[in-house]
């Protein structure tokens, strides 16, 4: 296939090994690669935008290999993609990749994910987009995930890529020789035990550190073909997952299941 114009972003920042590996792999395959990503760690920022302070971007080519044009931006992941599409890039890219994230983006955790938000900006702009994550904060070999994402993108772009489709890929933290088959999955619904650590600052005022542990994964039966496993189950079986996502959050249950609100009792004020 002809070389692609690829925009790459992330939420781990411009110094993260995951994005540098992905950008290098894309350039090695002959693609035209531009990186526009946060200049620092921006994990768990979701789809936040910077509206009350200036957004700045500086060249960061020296952090990447040959053939990669890079920018570090002081904004959120979503800011970075918006800025790239509207100011930095001379023309619309063929593909947006976000990652490789240092840690999983599974189930309903995607609502907090800056990685997925960056890819979603591409989807909203009508550009094919993929978010890529490794399901471990300790695993540091990003080569397999890079090749997997690029091969999937190259194949999918020669076939049918529906409008509003975002692909969310997670790979297990193990060698490729130990992995099972890549499979289509649906989002799990994750429930957490929230934890806050309360501390006192030198002025005697309390402050908090937030953490949490996933205590339950609810299989989201009915979302996608019923025979598909959840993304969490797929990763737990040491197999890579690929989950199709769209930005339309409209509820698709039965009308009879909605609360029986008498709408005629309400009027416009």
Swiss-Prot record:
A divalent metal cation binds at residues 11-12, 43, 101. It catalyses: a ribonucleoside 5'-phosphate + H2O = a ribonucleoside + phosphate. It is an enzyme of class 3 (hydrolase). InterPro entries: SurE, SurE-like_Pase/nucleotidase, SurE-like_sf. Its EC number is 3.1.3.5. Its main location: cytoplasm. This is 5'-nucleotidase SurE. The gene is surE.
